[in-house]
Curated annotation (Swiss-Prot):
PANTHER family: TRANSLATION FACTOR GUF1 HOMOLOG, CHLOROPLASTIC, TRANSLATION FACTOR GUF1-RELATED. Residues 609-626 have a biased composition (Basic and acidic residues). GO terms for molecular function: GTP binding; GTPase activity; ribosome binding; translation elongation factor activity. It is found in: Cell membrane. The gene is lepA. The lineage of its organism: Bacteria, Bacillati, Actinomycetota, Actinomycetes, Bifidobacteriales. Pfam families: EFG_C, GTP_EFTU, GTP_EFTU_D2, LepA_C. This is Elongation factor 4. It comes from Bifidobacterium animalis subsp. lactis (strain AD011).
């Protein structure tokens, strides 16, 4: 076969194999991807670095994959040159939506399992997703070079899970490269070729997009039918816009322009559009010369699990925050946001996230990539509140909570799957009960590991549940959760009052049993953070009109007796009474300004906050105030 036949746009569909690598966090997906890039020779030895496909600084620092990356890899088998389309996916539960989009662009999935850890919660979750997409599963044990690896034991676990023989489970080492060649051969043999029609009208599915400040929107596509040529006009079927493409190409592993993309291939299109609303993940691209009549089925829009407010420390940065969120939305289809105003914090956005890690990554990317200093409010989940007059309110922010009598509050629930060694069953049960969880079933997946299924309110999981689960099980337990309907609960809104005024940024919706502890925690924290004034300041926590906790910030006092050396007690008493009357009048007229740094510190180290940059933010707040 001539060299021409393996060029992008001319590759015979029967020689294409599209696959993704799925696994639990830290099971070695990115390392195996590195070895595949090295073996295929598309990355020269001197340019190779660890976690080659993790392009973001945050990914490199944290050692986690956040964005899926699609790469075209050549591979020879039995004297025939094949083209492999490889997608490296994230492993964390917050980025499941990234994984589901990657699965829709493939025909096969490499299920990677750490030979020292075995099957974990995300392994199962990703496996079930791959089965839902009808993908061919290739089971692989990674890290077999480690002394603590137990490949035989875990090969049997995997075999019983997916219904194959233990001998069918491949054994590789991402570190040494052992077994990777056999894995690539197995992909060529087992993964089916794409089934699109190369002669039909062109249809390509957008599965991701990024913003390039020089060239505009870069759209990642999977060709399903027909072909797209670089000189033809393109039509976005969902948005209804038409473009002359600046460039069409493949990623191998850097962008490589080509003349065309054919059926079954994965590549990119640069349209030159700068308007971020013009590229929607899940849309279908077709050619205006031979337009398709039916668009491809897109993706189900992800539902945010957690809401939080993002406010610029300097209010003048509000337009920049809007622009930054628009650009980030291109690259992160799961992020949703709308403008909001807070009495205390000014203008900002109410953002919806898939989880706490997702929230932390978004705030960090906004501050790094766009140079913004932000305050994020405590995370909330969406509630449905029915007032006594029958009106229903959807509440994503405590300030939207209706006043007056409440008939019913419904909160979102999740089905949590926890896998843990059997010696920690008691500790996990205690933790779930403390967080209002109810157990549904429990089964042993091997002689020493248990899978427990719980139904838990989402509000209990989004704060510190995962950290506590890890600490109580010495890091061995793993957690996966998904939406499981709603349930009525006894919830209340706790307001924080300073000098009798409600401060909306500190309000929270909590379970009645935890209302007192939240009130005590916030009042104590604010007492330390708010500077003393010339008069006494009461800090109160209230449910409706009932005060449940109180702290006082004592008044600063000038020593009015300093000039009295001895003398009559009535003279001293007169001066003290005069001071007292002045303080009383000041207390009635005085207004307490809560400094910006107090907001930053109280919200960053609140229950949900795990913000490591609190001190930097406080400094930035002080600068912007000064």
């Amino acid at each position: 076969m001539s060299e021409q036949h393996n060029q992008p746009g001319f590759t015979d569909q029967s020689l294409i194999r599209n696959f993704c690598i799925i696994a639990h966090i830290d099971h070695g997906k990115s390392t195996v991807a590195d070895r595949i890039l090295q073996l295929s020779g598309i990355v020269p030895e001197r340019e190779m670095r660890d976690r080659f496909l993790d392009r973001m600084d945050i990914e490199q620092e944290r050692g986690i994959t956040i964005k899926s990356q699609a790469v075209r890899v050549p591979w020879s088998y039995d004297g025939q040159e094949y083209t492999l389309g490889m997608i490296d996916t994230p492993g964390h539960v917050d980025f499941t939506y990234e994984v589901s989009r990657a699965l829709a662009a493939c025909e096969g999935a490499v299920l990677l399992v750490d030979a020292t850890q075995g099957i974990e919660a995300q392994t199962l979750s990703n496996l079930y997703m791959a089965i839902d997409h009808d993908l061919t599963i290739i089971p692989v044990l990674n890290k077999i070079d480690l002394p603590s690896a137990e490949p035989d034991k875990h090969a049997e676990e995997i075999a019983s899970l997916i219904g194959c023989e233990p001998s069918d489970v491949l054994r590789v080492s991402g570190k040494t490269g052992e077994g990777v060649r056999e894995l690539l051969d197995r992909i060529v043999v087992d993964v089916p070729a794409p089934t699109g029609d190369p002669d039909a009208d062109a249809r390509a599915l957008i599965f991701d997009s990024v913003y390039d400040s020089y060239r505009g929107i870069v759209t990642y596509i999977r060709m399903v039918d027909g072909e797209l040529r670089s000189r033809e006009k393109l039509h976005m079927m969902g948005v209804g816009t038409t473009y002359d493409p600046i460039e069409i190409g493949v990623i191998s592993p850097d962008m490589m322009p080509t003349r065309a993309l054919g059926a079954g291939e994965v590549g990119y299109v640069i349209t030159g559009a700068k308007d971020v609303s013009q590229s929607k993940v899940g849309d279908t691209i077709t050619s205006t010369a031979h337009p398709a009549t039916e668009p491809l089925p897109g993706y189900r829009d992800p539902q945010p699990m957690v809401y939080a407010g993002l406010f610029p420390i300097d209010n003048a940065q509000f337009p920049e925050l809007r622009e930054a969120l628009d650009k980030l939305k291109l690259n992160d289809a799961a992020l949703i946001y709308e403008p909001e105003t807070s009495v205390a914090l000014g203008f900002g956005f109410r953002c919806g996230f898939l989880g706490l890690l997702h929230m932390e990554i978004v705030s960090e990317r906004l501050s790094r990539e766009f140079g913004l200093d932000l305050i994020s409010t405590a995370p909330n989940v969406p509630y449905e509140v029915t007032a006594e007059d029958g009106t229903v309110h959807r509440v994503t922010n405590p300030s939207e909570f209706p006043d007056g009598k409440i008939k019913r509050i419904v909160e979102p629930m999740v089905a949590a799957d926890i896998i843990t060694p059997k010696e920690f069953i008691g500790a996990v049960m205690d933790l779930c009960q403390e967080h209002r969880g109810t157990m549904s079933t429990m089964e042993y997946i091997s002689t020493d590991r248990v899978e427990m299924h719980y139904r838990i309110p989402l509000a209990e999981i989004v704060f510190d549940f995962f950290d506590q689960l890890k600490s109580r099980t010495k890091g061995y337990a793993s957690l996966d959760y998904h939406d499981d309907g709603e349930e009525a609960a006894d919830l209340v809104k706790v307001d924080i009052l300073i000098q009798g005024e409600k401060i909306d940024a500190f309000s929270a919706i909590v379970h009645r049993d935890k209302a007192y502890s939240y009130g005590v925690m916030m009042t104590k924290k604010l007492r330390e953070l708010i500077p003393r004034q010339q008069f006494e300041i009461p800090i109160q926590a209230a449910i409706g009109s009932r005060i449940i906790a109180r702290e006082n910030i004592r008044a600063l006092r000038k020593d009015v007796l300093a000039k009295c050396y001895g003398g009559d007690i009535t003279r001293k008493r007169k001066l003290l009474e005069k001071q007292k009357a002045g303080k009383k009048r000041m207390k009635m007229l005085g207004h307490v300004e809560v400094p910006q740094e107090a907001f930053v510190a109280a919200l960053s180290t609140g229950e949900g906050g795990n913000d490591r940059d609190t001190k930097d933010k406080i400094r930035a707040a002080q600068k912007s105030e000064g």
